[in-house]
Curated annotation (Swiss-Prot):
ATP binds at G620, P621, N622, M623, A624, G625, K626, S627. Keywords: ATP-binding, DNA damage, DNA repair, DNA-binding, Nucleotide-binding. Pfam families: MutS_I, MutS_II, MutS_III, MutS_IV, MutS_V. This is DNA mismatch repair protein MutS. The lineage of its organism: Bacteria, Pseudomonadati, Thermodesulfobacteriota, Desulfuromonadia, Desulfuromonadales.
Length: 870
């Protein structure tokens, strides 16, 4: 460009500081974007692209949006993967000569979206940072700037790190430049959508990070945060603080003290387990409906919705904490009236965590304060209802809830019931809140009346009947007296202008009024905004009280949600202890039962321990319910550990430290792994990390290779789990390899189970009931028929199966698969012979019975015998 205006020079100087962000440059009532930013933004936002210097040789692309409605536009740009730098006018244009000073006040990134209205209410919006040592210890820090939650942990190994990151689902991940490629490889193929941002290596220096954290939290040591001896955690948390300080420009005072958590405090769930058990999203479409969260989440606040997600992803392993949750949920199930009242009151509580953060960052409007006030007004009733409960956890929650009546009264006195969104156009504050504001409003509303009254008062005081009070734009307000009455003018009148036939005066009272009325409109709006800012700061000073209350309400909301589900779905309180037992009577799959698919859900038992019933080998046809049964056991176990009641007639569950699942498999082309390689990698992870307190769900092992290889690997895996005392984990092992049912011959803690099936008119009926013993047939061809394979294919499959099962061989010793049944007749299909007439004692007894010779009593006895045989 040959010649730049002062404004464009200012723009380019600021843009140079934020080259990786789209710059929203404030010009009056608009944010303008120029050059490449304008081209990019206009395309994403679908707004008009125009230009400055239109028609000139060097046009400057330009687009803009109204400043007061910018948030949806910012959200769309961030969703598209861009950062947005918000550049504001930091001087009043009315008081400045020349160019107005402008500064970037914040940078919005995927992990630092501060406008909660554009976020999913019941999900956190985490910014994460990862630091890794040469020994592969990973520090992981996460911050939700919209709630102030700041947590950090250290884990060991790639699998644990990847699993933790996936459970948090951050929107943005910070890494040092030298570790960026390593972390990208770590998370390759993981289920999640995030932006990875590199930080300069010096930012992640351990000493610098420690000092940065101490400065940020104004403390002399990190000991109180529990991370002083966790160097990678300190580096990760220090990276987060650096990024926040660089982008948020000193408005992060609401961030809570750093909380260090450890994996040993929670049940370990790897990424595969979270995905396969569909804890918070389904495998089919990633939706919430059809997941465990979709069933258990009946929370009525956004805070509770985020909290229950955390509880599901991080089940407890501390018996006392688990029992406290169970006792509270159980009491709330029984106290239906109290439960209903509490849920009704909580339903009127807004998202206090995010409102509190908006206020602390100076982004809250008057409607946000009204929402805060309405929420505070619910607290005394909530505390009153909590007094009716006796469970220790409920009492603890009550002690953490601050009624905040002083804040509710303050906001109620200050802010009108239905304030406008815009803060600088008045109408925010209540009458009677501030004396000067009331006077300015009175002047604005009653200016003519005041002038008329002053005129009448002065006429009476002076006795001049023709005295007039007038106004013009040149001289302002004045009192006009004709020359014939100048002798009656009081001493306090001061001459302002002389005319041919009159004199114009002012008094101190009129001068004061003039100053008030001429500046009343601007002063009114400015004062009201100042008063609002002052009020917002006063509320922000109480942020810690609000945070504590919000945390307690979120926990209460989760307990109420679990109680509501337990009551309506007939859940029971499990017995939990430190044993190795896992006994569930009439257990039900919580999600499938709730989906009401038109089929009565058949409950099933499980009885496992590490002494006699360690490994359950489950056989049966596809679609019979093996996977449902195993997932059901895993979900009930997880629910018990998170503090929920469980779908069963009764349950006795010893503490479980980990749940592993290996369910199905598919190619991982991104990492160059075949189906079989994925399967073996998952199996290796289980065998290397399981303990005697773990629960393992294996749904098919060895399917991705040849039959003999698959059987060999599956057998060896089962033996390893059985024979190695340091593993010896309770295992549910579903398989189509019927050879594995012979494990009971060599492994004393292996038991066989199968899914009951019945035949009827060459159709199979899935009874969905788990019974002892191995399955007699796989019924694969019948399942293929149910799937809709052509009749010709089904018939041909039967012929081939006959050849295989009869052992017919060709001359070269291979199975004679091509052999067809002679004479166009199909051979009988042994796969369908559940009721072989030659071997079925029920058929034999029925065939030998002469019903004409027996009495009714003998008939009943005979039926009783048959029933025992069946």
């Amino acid at each position: 460009m040959t010649k730049l205006t002062p404004m464009m020079r200012q723009y380019l100087d600021i843009k140079a500081q934020y080259p990786d962000a789209i710059l929203f440059f404030r010009l009056g009532d608009f944010y303008e974007m120029f050059m490449e930013d304008a081209v990019t933004a206009s395309r994403i936002l679908d707004i008009t692209l125009t230009s400055r210097n239109k028609g000139a040789a060097e046009e400057v692309p330009l687009c803009g949006i109204p400043y007061h409605s910018c948030q949806p536009y910012v959200a769309r740009l961030v969703e598209a993967g861009h950062k947005v730098a918000i550049c504001e006018q930091v001087e009043d244009p009315k008081t400045v000569k020349g160019i107005v000073k402008r500064e970037v006040v914040r940078v919005v990134t995927p992990g630092l979206v501060v406008d909660a209205d554009t976020l999913t209410p019941k999900e956190n919006n985490f910014l994460a940072a990862i630091a890794v040592s040469a020994q592969e210890r990973y520090g992981i820090a996460v911050l939700d700037i919209t709630t102030g939650e700041f947590r950090v942990t250290e884990v060991e190994g790639r699998e644990a790190a990847c699993s933790e990151v996936v459970s948090l689902q951050p929107r943005e991940i910070l890494v040092s430049e030298d570790q960026q490629q390593f972390c990208e490889q770590l998370l390759q193929g993981a289920s999640g959508s995030w932006l990875i941002n590199p930080l300069p290596d010096w930012v992640c220096d351990l000493e610098a990070c420690g000092q940065r954290l101490q400065s940020f939290f104004n403390c002399g040591s990190l000991e109180s945060f529990g991370c002083a001896r966790l160097p990678e955690a300190v580096r990760a948390a220090g990276g987060v603080v650096y990024y926040v300080e660089q982008t948020q420009k000193g408005v992060a005072g609401h961030i809570r003290p750093l909380v260090t958590y450890h994996s040993r405090d929670y049940m370990v769930l790897d990424n595969s387990t979270r995905r396969n058990l569909e804890l918070t999203a389904t495998l089919q479409d990633g939706g919430r409906k059809g997941s465990l969260l979709g069933v258990l989440d009946r929370t009525v606040t956004a805070m509770g919705g985020r909290k229950i997600r955390q509880w599901i992803h991080h089940p407890l392993v501390d018996l006392k904490a688990i029992r406290d949750r169970h006792l509270s949920v159980q009491e709330l199930v029984g106290q239906s009236l109290v439960r209903g009242d509490l849920r009704a009151d909580l339903d009127g509580v807004y998202d206090l965590e995010r409102l509190n953060s908006k206020i602390a960052m100076g982004h809250a409007n008057a409607k946000d304060l009204v929402a805060l006030r309405k929420s505070f007004e619910k607290l005394p009733r909530i505390l009153q209802h909590l007094d009716e409960l006796s469970a220790p956890l409920a009492a603890g929650i009550g002690s953490r809830i601050d009624p905040l009546t002083d804040m509710a009264e303050l906001i109620g006195r200050a802010i009108v019931e239905d304030p406008p969104f815009v803060l600088r156009e008045g109408g925010l504050m209540c009458d009677g809140y501030h004396l000067e504001l009331d006077e300015l409003r009175d002047i604005r509303r009653n200016g003519k009346e005041w002038i008329a009254k002053l005129e009448a008062d002065e006429r009476e005081r002076t006795g001049i009947g023709s005295l007039k009070v007038r106004f013009n734009k040149v001289f302002g307000y004045y009192i006009e007296v004709t020359r014939t009455h100048l002798g009656r003018v009081p001493e306090d009148y001061q001459r302002k202008q002389t005319l041919a036939n009159a004199e114009r005066f002012f008094t101190p009272q009129l001068k004061e009024y003039e100053e008030k009325v001429l500046g009343a409109e601007d002063r009114l709006f400015d004062l009201e905004f100042e008063l609002f800012q002052d009020l917002r700061e006063r509320v922000a000073e109480q942020g810690e009280r609000v945070q504590r209350t919000a945390e307690a309400l979120a926990e209460l909301d989760v307990l109420l949600s679990l109680a509501d589900v337990a009551h309506s779905c007939d859940y029971v309180c499990p017995t939990m202890d430190d044993s190795d037992r896992l006994v569930i009577r009439d257990g039900r799959h919580p999600v499938i039962e709730a989906m009401n698919l038109g089929e009565h859900f058949v409950p099933n038992d499980v009885e496992m321990d590490c002494r006699e019933n360690q490994i359950m080998v489950i056989t049966g046809p596809n679609m019979a319910g093996k996977s449902t049964y195993m997932r059901q056991v895993a979900l009930i176990t997880l629910m018990a550990h998170m503090g929920s009641l469980v779908p069963a007639a009764s349950a006795h569950i010893g503490l479980v430290d980990r749940i592993f699942t290996r369910v199905g498999a598919s190619d991982n082309l991104a990492q160059g792994q075949s189906t079989f390689m994925v399967e073996m990698t998952e199996a290796a992870h289980i065998l290397n990390h399981a303990t005697s307190r773990s629960l393992i769900v294996l749904d098919e092992i060895g399917r991705g290779t040849s039959t003999f290889d698959g059987i060999s690997i599956a057998w060896a895996v089962a033996e390893y789990l059985h024979d190695n005392g340091h593993v010896a984990a309770k295992t549910l092992f579903a398989t189509h390899y019927h050879e594995l049912t012979d494990l009971i011959l060599t492994c004393e803690r292996v038991k066989n189970l199968n899914i009951a099936v019945r035949e009827w008119n060459e159709q199979i009926i899935f009874l969905r009931k788990i019974v002892k013993g191995p399955a007699s047939h796989s019924y694969g061809i019948q399942v293929a028929r149910l799937a809709g394979l052509p009749v010709a294919v089904i018939d041909r499959a039967k012929e081939i199966l006959v050849n295989l099962e009869s052992g017919e061989l060709a001359e070269e010793g291979q199975p004679r698969l091509a052999q067809r049944a002679g004479g166009g007749q199909h051979r009988p299909n042994p796969q369908m012979s559940l009721f072989d007439a030659a071997a079925d004692p029920v058929r034999e007894k029925l065939a030998a019975l002469d019903i004409s010779t027996i009495s009714p009593l003998e008939g009943l006895n005979f039926l009783h015998e048959l029933q025992k045989l069946v």
